[in-house]
Regions:
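Long, internal low-complexity/basic segments
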Residues: 2, 286, 333, 339, ...
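C-terminal cap/loop subdomain of S1 sulfatases and analogous C-terminal strand-loop tails that border
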Residues: 106-107, 111-117, 238-243, 248-256, ...
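Histidine-centered active-site microenvironments of extracellular/periplasmic hydrolases
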Residues: 95-104, 183-188, 193-198, 217-270, ...
Length: 457
């Protein structure tokens, strides 16, 4: 069953925070404070300066999901579920309490931060060599494994699912493939043009498709098909507008191409193959929906923005959601809200039902709608919590491996692996404000996202 109007935030960490907490990313500080890359020009864009520790050494702030947040993993653990996070975490990479096993996951495998090299398992950050760090772990200990990250995550999912036959508990397994996030590393056996980024992306996508098939098959082969809800979706749009068609925009924009995602659900007896549903759903809605399906407790200290969509998804009726706040003031993106058929992005208004490609600004002829939506998104922005106390800093400033406990006793093989990667990295930051790599050839970057297609010059 396909959801035709499923939405997320426009970048990865905010979406993951909303998925795990049922709350808009601005409430958890995840809408832009998910990671400090240490690039002065990028920090300046956020109104920050490069952090220094008490010894005067430049370092990075620790940004992570607040441990006071209740995650869906914790809620399902309370309901008696086995919980596992396989793949990308991106909600804290340093202190143990911020890592998956400190946030409700019994089993962890994969990487903590944002864009890992699929072969070396290092986070290079498109940054000076000193920032390269190893980021591949099993149960929060460094894992030395050869192979392509997408394949390794699929293999771990197969092992974890098979092991559930010896465990009477129901399970929640969050498989967060890094593909097709950069860097562009073609999978094994790639026979296309190594200088063609689109050919590499297509190969990475095919590899992802095969990996998802392996996970689905593992569920079926181990006898869990009929009582398992299997969901496939994404955390944000693509980096190229060409890949967003028919929608406009890219990742890191709140155009439809940045926030509208594919969403496929399979639950035999509850979803009908080949069908689709019209109606709004936001990624945070999975939080209360999962708790209802698991027979868990909805009561908690912090209110959620997610809406229980159990009845709409698996029974008759309509979606209960009529509003989505994609970004509010204080973000690096335009305040954007959708209410019903209308979406306001800054001063621009679109009727998404009539104009899903967002080609016609109707703000001038719908001033009443603009006023109403602006008042609403402004009101939500005023609910943003303060930054809080003095930020935590990463120490040592330039670790070999993510995870403060893992850095305390780094094995020789890991040090050598990181040194080898650092020897090939540039010594200084690339020009520009963003810490991300330049857009590949053929990119059509939106004016809103702050990125420049340097290759077009």
């Amino acid at each position: 069953m396909r959801l035709n109007e499923f939405y997320t935030h426009s970048v990865c960490a905010p979406t993951r925070a909303a998925f795990l907490t049922g709350r808009y990313a601005f409430r958890t500080g995840s809408d832009w404070r998910s990671e400090d890359f240490g690039k002065p020009s990028y920090l300046a864009k956020l109104g920050l300066k490069l952090a220094h520790n008490d010894r005067g050494e430049p370092t990075r702030r620790i940004h992570a999901l607040d441990t006071e947040e209740r995650t869906v993993a914790e809620a399902l653990q309370e309901a008696g579920y086995f919980t596992a996070l396989l793949g990308k975490w991106h909600l804290g990479e340093w202190l143990p309490e911020h890592l998956p096993m400190g946030q409700g996951f019994e089993h962890q495998y994969g990487h903590y931060a944002w864009g890992i090299d699929y072969y070396t398992k290092t986070i290079v950050h498109n940054a000076p060599a000193r920032f390269a760090v190893y980021d591949w772990h099993r149960n929060q200990k460094p894992a030395k494994e050869d192979g392509y990250a997408t394949d390794l995550i699929a293999a771990e999912a197969e092992r974890v699912i098979a092991a559930r036959k010896n465990d009477d508990r129901p399970f929640f397994i969050y498989v967060a493939f890094n593909a097709v996030h950069g860097p562009l590393n073609p999978p094994p056996g790639f026979d296309g043009d190594p200088n063609d980024p689109m050919a590499i992306r297509h190969a990475m996508l095919k590899s992802l498709d095969q990996a998802v098939g392996r996970v689905s098959k593992a569920i079926d082969d181990n006898g869990f098909r009929d009582n398992t809800l299997f969901i496939f979706t994404n955390d944000n749009g693509p980096v190229l507008e060409e890949l967003s068609k028919p929608f406009r925009g890219t990742k890191n924009t709140t155009f439809e191409g940045g926030v509208r995602q594919p969403a496929i659900l399979r639950w035999p007896g509850h979803t009908k193959p080949g069908t689709s549903k019209d109606g709004l759903m936001f990624v945070a809605d999975f939080f209360p929906t999962f708790i209802t399906l698991a027979g868990g407790k909805h009561e908690q200290k912090r209110p959620i923005d997610g809406i229980d969509q159990t009845a709409w998804l698996f029974e008759d009726g309509e979606s209960k959601r009529n509003e989505i706040a994609f970004d509010v003031s204080g973000s690096v993106r335009l305040p954007t809200i959708r209410v019903g058929e209308y979406k306001l992005m800054g001063d621009v208004l679109y009727n998404i039902r009539k104009d899903p490609s967002e080609q016609t600004d109707i703000a001038a002829t719908h001033s009443d709608v603009v006023s109403k939506l602006r008042a609403r998104v402004t009101s939500l922005g005023q609910e943003r919590p303060p930054l809080g106390h003095k930020p935590l800093l990463m120490d040592p400033p330039l670790p070999y491996v993510y995870g403060s406990d893992e850095q305390k006793d780094v094995p020789p093989w890991l040090i050598e692996a990181v040194k080898e990667v650092r020897a090939k990295q540039p010594t200084e930051w690339a020009p520009g404000e963003t810490p991300w790599p330049k857009a590949p050839k053929g990119a059509v970057a939106s004016k809103m996202d702050g990125l420049k297609d340097e290759l077009a010059k």
